[in-house]
Amino acid sequence: MASAISHAQLNAQLSQGTVAPLYAVVGEEDLLRDMALGALKTALLGEGQSDFNCDLFYGDDASGTEIVTCASEVAVFSARRVVVVRAADKLPARECEALLPYLKEPNDTTAMIFAAPKLDGRLKFTQALTRTAVMVDCSPLREAQWLPWLRQDAER
């Protein structure tokens, strides 16, 4: 199982130009999830092109085949394309099955990002995702973590 990185570690990796084809942004803290998604989109696509090569799906309304098809497309006027699946925890099991082959061999020019408050570790999809994706931990911060986090955020 891949170890999870913090929001700060994600920002450090992105500032060094280190990107992965698969990310799982997981945790109950909505603000941290949204900030991680924003940082990923900006780092992967740049400031002005975030909508042109970015596709957004919602787990409760998405087809696994459609997500894979979209992720397999070539980026236009950019080095990368980004596919975001919000509420990935709500993807039906049959749609998750369609994603398994892609998780084994992701497209190098696409970053697929799954975001959810929590994922069910019993599912094959979640097990495959935790083995192959960069896991970004967006759990609520403990009291001692708030002040350093606020300082770092204010510096940006």
Task: Explain the meaning of each model-derived region.
Residues M1-R156:
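Conserved beta/loop motifs at nucleotide-recognition and modification sites
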